[in-house]
Amino acid sequence: MTVITRFAPSPTGKLHIGNVRVALVNWLYAQKYNGNFILRIDDTDRDRSKVEYHEAIIKDLQWLGINWNSSFLQSIRFNKYKAAKQYLISSGRLYECYETPEMLEIERKRQLTSGYPPIYSRKALELTKAQKVQLQAEGYKVHYRFLIDRNKPIIWNDLIKGEIKYDGSNISDPIVIKEDGTMIYMLCSVIDDIEYRISHIIRGEDHITNTAIQIQMFEALGAAIPQLGHLSLIKSDSGKISKRIGGFTIDYLRDQLGIEPMAVNNLLALSGTSNNVDAYFSLESLITKFDLSAFSKSAIIYNENELVTLNHKLLVNTEYDTIKHRLTAIGLPDVTKEFWLAVRHNLNTLNDIKIWWQICYLPTLDKFQEQDAEFLKLAAGLLPSGKLTDNSWDDWVQNIIKATNRRGKALFMPLRLALTGITYGPELKYLLPLIGGEEVKARLLRHQ
């Protein structure tokens, strides 16, 4: 059997780390077993689906390195769904309903007030043909529900959570075709999964009830049921992550926070598993590590600091030749290999390099302790002559110690403030050659 997985986002908002984790896990599973990965755009919601969100989904997945063997829109397949609709009607698994949303809301409130779960009463099954004609004449529009078989339990062996059981009597018959004739994604999804021979459906645990319903849809259409797995959800400190909550979307991580794609991939592929979350440089490494059985049943708490730490580890170990084109893209084409090696240990994101470029070549040095003026003047006079190298710092410091007897913070902090304007950063021994001898002296003497 060829492994075929799919990712089926709705273009009604931006991708966030929760649904991208689903995409990544499905992609990794397909790659692990030399299978195929399909991107399906669930755009059946005509009112909320937007072209710009579809384009953003493509951009985000490509940025992460997640590619697909084929892709399609559900909206272009509505005609293909008609045959399944007629089959389910003729077999008695789809039935006509005429209640308005207001009528259904009244029924729901009545059930809750009486202490019953809000499960559809199936009153529409009692309608005669004449009553249906009368309702249509009065302006009521037909929609269709899928008839759940409530006489048998729904059971499957979940790839992540183990055996899951559902009592069909606790599930309301879902509306699958709206009044305007549009088929809702729940049934469309099953029809597509059958036609595209999806072998494994892996998605978030918030879809477990949908899965129970869709198992019966597969059976009603006479199709084999794919293997099913449900990932635990990613949560923030304040609760569930959503595409409508800022700070978790992929475009925010990329465009505002400046995170590397492999930092996102590492965090999402390894968090909540028995593997350590580490900074791997390639998706191929994650494919090797991937094991669906290693995923925990417990929810994951998203920590942005952990993502930034992974990002830092990646940058620290990135070679200059690999990053040079990216530096040009962010407006720093003149960054040399020496500069990159000097500052990369102090970068949390690639954009941080702009800070060090500013410090070395376009400084605004306003931090200065007046009591250190004489010390800095003396230090300027002891600076080695000629072109500064990585070894110049050690020679310079030894000369300063001999002349002033200053050591430790009393020696280093005035020099760092005078040369960079801040109290932290790359080792000064690496910054000196970048700043250059004349500029070093000028900064030391600027308040004389």
Swiss-Prot record:
UniProt motif 'KMSKS' region: location: 240-244
Protein keywords: Aminoacyl-tRNA synthetase, ATP-binding, Cytoplasm, Ligase, Nucleotide-binding, Protein biosynthesis
Motif 'HIGH' region, residue range(s) on this chain: 9-19
Transmembrane feature ranges: none
GO biological process, one term: glutamyl-tRNA aminoacylation
Binding site for ATP: K243
Main localization category: cytoplasm
SUPFAM superfamilies on file: An anticodon-binding domain of class I aminoacyl-tRNA synthetases, Nucleotidylyl transferase
InterPro entries recorded: aa-tRNA-synth_I_cd-bd (IPR045462), aa-tRNA-synth_I_codon-bd_sub2 (IPR020751), aa-tRNA-synth_I_CS (IPR001412), aa_tRNA-synth_I_cd-bd_sf (IPR008925), Glu-tRNA-ligase_bac/mito (IPR004527), Glu/Gln-tRNA-synth (IPR000924), Glu/Gln-tRNA-synth_Ib_cat-dom (IPR020058), GluQ/Sye (IPR049940)
One Gene Ontology term of the molecular function aspect: glutamate-tRNA ligase activity
Cellular component aspect of the GO annotation: cytoplasm
Reported function: Catalyzes the attachment of glutamate to tRNA(Glu) in a two-step reaction: glutamate is first activated by ATP to form Glu-AMP and then transferred to the acceptor end of tRNA(Glu).
UniProt xrefs under NCBIfam families: gltX_bact
UniProt family annotation: Belongs to the class-I aminoacyl-tRNA synthetase family. Glutamate--tRNA ligase type 1 subfamily.
Protein name: Glutamate--tRNA ligase 2
